[in-house]
A protein has these predicted regions:
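A cross-family phosphate/adenosyl-ligand binding-site feature
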Residues: 1-101, 140-186
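Internal catalytic-core helix/loop-beta-alpha segment
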Residues: 86-125
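Short, acidic/small-residue loops that bind anionic groups at enzyme active sites
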Residues: 68, 108, 115, 122-148, ...
Length: 186
């Protein structure tokens, strides 16, 4: 049995942000997943970075699975053109199912929802509830303040260095995908 990365869960903003480079990053990331035949698992939205990510993966012939709570479907932000859209009851179920369907996790730029998802997945790995890599794509230094905080948490004795090391950080999307795939030995 040779484990490999077949599906990647991507957390990112339901907004586009005010820097067009982030939207471009989401599109390039979606297309890169399709090129590598990696299924995109994401939060199921049709707007913001989430929508751009999914649309680009689909346009490049990729498989896209969205997981969205009924609350957001009711607000009509669900993406109806996906390979598969799973509707769940709660935000917690959404995170759990996204994790179940994925081999690894990546956060692109986003806000507190993105942070919530990344930190929960990272906590699952830290606690041994799963053995899936977690990564941060630090595009244009967006996450520099977060990385500085994590280093501060290590210095202050609240984050063991071995747990800090569980979060991979890259600035380039292809380097990040290469590193994730290498962690599976494929």
């Amino acid at each position: 049995y040779n484990p490999s990365m077949h599906a990647l869960c991507v957390f990112c903003g339901s907004s586009s942000g005010n820097d067009p480079a982030h939207l471009d990053l989401a599109r390039r990331f979606g297309a890169a997943l399709a090129r590598r035949s990696i299924t995109l698992v994401y939060g199921g939205g049709r707007v913001g970075l989430m929508g751009a990510l999914a649309d680009a993966a689909l346009a490049a012939g990729g498989r896209v699975i969205g997981v969205i709570p009924q609350l957001l479907m009711d607000k009509e932000v669900g993406h109806t053109g996906l390979t598969d859209l799973r509707v769940v009851d709660t935000m917690s179920e959404r995170k759990w199912l996204m994790g179940e369907l994925s081999d690894a996790f990546v956060a692109l730029p986003g806000g507190i929802g993105t942070m919530d998802e990344l930190f929960e997945a990272w906590t699952w790995t830290q606690l041994g509830l799963q053995r899936k890599p977690c990564a941060l794509l630090n595009h244009r230094g967006y996450y520099d303040p977060l990385i500085a905080f994590l280093d501060r948490a290590v210095e202050a004795g609240f984050l063991p260095p071995r747990h800090r090391a569980l979060l991979l950080v890259e600035q380039d999307l292809e380097s990040l995908l290469d590193r994730l795939e290498a962690s599976f030995g494929n």
